[in-house]
Amino acid sequence: MKKLITTSALLILFFNLSVFAASNSSSKTKGWWNVPYPGTFDTSQLVNEQAFIRVKGNKLVDEKGTTFIFRGVNIADPDKLRTENQWSLSLFEELKDWGANVVRLPIHPISWQKNGKEEYFKIIDQAVIWANSLDMYLIIDWHSIGYLPDELFQHPMYDTTKKETFAFWKDVSFRYAGVATIAVYELFNEPTDQGGRAGKANWHDWKTINEQLIDVIYAHDKNVIPLIAGFNWAYDLRPIKQHPVARKGIAYAVHPYPQKAKPKVKSKQNFFDLWESVWGFAAKDYPVIATELGWVSADGLGAHIPVINDGSYGPQIMEFMQERNISWVVWAFDPLWSPTMIKDWNFTPTEQGSFFKKQLQQHK
């Protein structure tokens, strides 16, 4: 008898759960025929008519054909900043005061998934409005680390899929088509196979997937600059010597942190020679944007490979990039994400923050 009652109870529970699941699924699709199509960004909210930045040969130029160099900073993921009550116009005003003409938004897949695209678009919309009001540009960065063709990634915060990545750029390029403030789409932050731990990187596959992403973007908007990274965590561009990405209007990204180059003798010329051979050469034929760079002392906050340096890196990398018209965006304007540019939310500069602030203000 006891067994019969237990079995009956289980059957009732299973029935109730099945009904709940069916009704819950129904609530998600109820009235699906009335769900509107996605909308584009309302440009009437913008106060400045900014020039589109375009690719001309190996340079970035404005609409008058004048060479344009992006000089700016990375902020933390906007969702992180919003959660910490630091997402505001005043943050962008501080960046403008430092001399930045561009802000990179590192959008992590986990952050995008947590919010959903409609909610995250509200955050990006705010960035567009604030940046436009201050005549600054934006780089939208799909901030994943790993090897997308194999869908293997360095940490759960970077986990994504090919489908999600394509959908992200499809939706972003549709929403912000024709918005000059968003100048650059960085297709994938740092491709790496982690020494084979995330599969085996193959340039042909990586080249193909980037070309397909660019085709999706260009189908919606041809007024943006697709930015493509090389292997070794966005450091090695040597494969493009023989097999460049076969699309027009593109630029290449590099993250030349100090410990990436490892000369036997640490002289300026030896660093220059190594940088030139691995990524600097690309600036002869294409625009190059160093979308992450920076350093921290060995005993500094968050010191880790490959960003540790005694400070000699700063002047050297700036000289190298200036000689080649390479744009640059420092990591990171946040007191926690190392190498940090600020010590606190009073915007007290760190060692590298002080150095790069002087560099930025030379071009205000």
What are the language-model segments listed below?
Residues 8-18:
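Bacterial N-terminal signal peptides
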Residues 83-102, 106-107, 113-144, 150-187, ...:
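An active-site-proximal structural segment forming one wall of the substrate-binding cleft
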